[in-house]
A protein has these predicted regions:
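Bacterial N-terminal signal peptides that target proteins for export
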Residues: 1-9
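Lipid interaction determinants
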Residues: 21-169
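C-terminal motif of bacterial Sec signal peptides marking the signal peptidase cleavage site
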Residues: 16-20
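Intrinsic disorder/low-complexity polar-acidic segments
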Residues: 12-14
């Protein structure tokens, strides 16, 4: 009797080995079904907003805009096929400036690409870098709660990271 119990427990412990693992991300869970808001843009490895501004007045204007509901938002819509997902991106940059385009991501190698067809920065430095980050993003990291888009600004060797969080699902 005791031997049978140990054999059953042993078989149950082996089940995870037979179920296999998938080494790609669930791109649909990461990107779709939620609105994401920019938290900050930083150099890769950093944890605070990069200093894009020439003076405190510009920075304050950008940060006040970032704090508003409905600004710096992105919504990814798409369909998956194997490890690939592609679709439309929409959202807002700053008040009165909508965002639209297409995007794709690969769950196997974490590649990301966006083609932004609508979006203006209104002269705001953070908005300019937000749009540039979306347009130049080459890869992503994250999960269903946090999203990081990595990009290099035009003419720069430094990698930047756009940090997003979920505002609603």
């Amino acid at each position: 009797m005791k031997k049978s119990i140990f054999q059953i427990i042993g078989l149950l412990l082996l089940l995870p080995l037979f179920s296999g693992c998938n080494d790609s991300d669930d791109v649909a869970a990461i990107f779709t079904g939620k609105t994401r808001k920019l938290n900050y843009i930083t150099v890769d490895g950093g944890h605070e907003m990069f200093g894009f501004w020439e003076n405190e007045a510009e920075k304050k204007k950008s940060m006040d805009e970032l704090k508003k509901n409905g600004t710096y938002n992105v919504i990814f819509e798409g369909t998956t096929e194997d490890d690939l997902i592609k679709g439309n991106i929409r959202g807002s940059v700053i008040t009165s400036y909508p965002l639209a385009g297409t995007w794709s991501a690969n769950g196997k190698d974490n590649k990301f690409k966006a083609n932004i067809t609508e979006g203006k920065d209104g002269g705001d430095k953070l908005a300019k870098n937000f749009l540039e980050g979306l347009k130049n993003a080459t890869s992503y990291e994250g999960d269903s709660k946090n999203l990081y888009l990595l990009y290099k600004p035009t003419g720069s060797q430094q990698t930047f990271r756009m940090v997003f969080y979920v505002v609603n699902q």
